[in-house]
Amino acid sequence: MASKRALVILAKGAEEMETVIPVDVMRRAGIKVTIAGLAGKDPVQCSRDVVICPDASLEDAKKEGPYDVVVLPGGNLGAQNLSESAAVKEILKEQENRKGLIAAICAGPTALLAHEIGFGSKVTTHPLAKDKMMNGGHYTYSENRVEKDGLILTSRGPGTSFEFALAIVEALNGKEVAAQVKAPLVLKD
């Protein structure tokens, strides 16, 4: 069986932990991850001034699709940039139409709202993004640290990044693989 594939869309101002932790955990699970730079292949400055080098531009990565999951990290500016991108809208619409998994964390789910993705789903966000996410009544809000409703998987923030990443692994590769990846991470239960 071919390994699963993930597209992580990296925008300027993305939250570092919400980008790197899911990438690392998914790669540990054997998922082929592509970090795609929204603005190209140049290094991206994240919300706390960590610089991440994308594997490809979003334009080039899109040509290699479809992906088993599209991941949207948070960070206020990063989420705003994802929300304003026509390319992100196109990728999310294609992913939704083909019934592929979409995962977003922290403020990242607000890009789902901006692009009208997953309406009717139960979601969670960073507490500061809750009001924005609930504007218009398109979603049901959950206070859970990670919420999976069908093919929409959301999480709350930097402190839930490992749980978010492991939920993606479980959705793509099953509980057993997620447990195998989790064990050596020495996470608190």
UniProtKB/Swiss-Prot annotation:
Keyword Transmembrane listed: no
Modified residues (N-acetylalanine): A2
Enzyme Commission number: 3.1.2.-, 3.5.1.-, 3.5.1.124
Subcellular location: Cell membrane; Cytoplasm; Nucleus; Membrane raft
Membrane association type: Lipid-anchor
Reaction catalysis annotation: N(omega)-(1-hydroxy-2-oxopropyl)-L-arginyl-[protein] + H2O = lactate + L-arginyl-[protein] + H(+); N(6)-(1-hydroxy-2-oxopropyl)-L-lysyl-[protein] + H2O = lactate + L-lysyl-[protein] + H(+); S-(1-hydroxy-2-oxopropyl)-L-cysteinyl-[protein] + H2O = lactate + L-cysteinyl-[protein] + H(+); N(omega)-(1-hydroxy-2-oxoethyl)-L-arginyl-[protein] + H2O = L-arginyl-[protein] + glycolate + H(+)
The family this protein is said to belong to: Belongs to the peptidase C56 family.
Protein name: Parkinson disease protein 7 homolog
GO CC entries: cytoplasm; cytosol; endoplasmic reticulum; membrane raft; mitochondrion; nucleus; plasma membrane
UniProt modified residues of type Cysteine sulfinic acid (-SO2H): C106
Lineage start: Eukaryota, Metazoa, Chordata, Craniata, Vertebrata
Gene Ontology molecular function: copper ion binding; glyoxalase (glycolic acid-forming) activity; mercury ion binding; mRNA binding; oxidoreductase activity, acting on peroxide as acceptor; peptidase activity; protein deglycase activity; protein homodimerization activity
InterPro entries: Class_I_gatase-like, DJ-1, DJ-1/PfpI, Prot/Nucl_acid_deglycase
Gene: PARK7
Processing and modification events after translation: Sumoylated on Lys-130 by PIAS2 or PIAS4; which is essential for cell-growth promoting activity and transforming activity.
SUPFAM superfamilies cross-referenced by the UniProt entry: Class I glutamine amidotransferase-like
Enzyme class, first EC level, given as a word: hydrolase
Residues found modified as Phosphotyrosine: Y67
Protein origin, superkingdom: Eukaryota
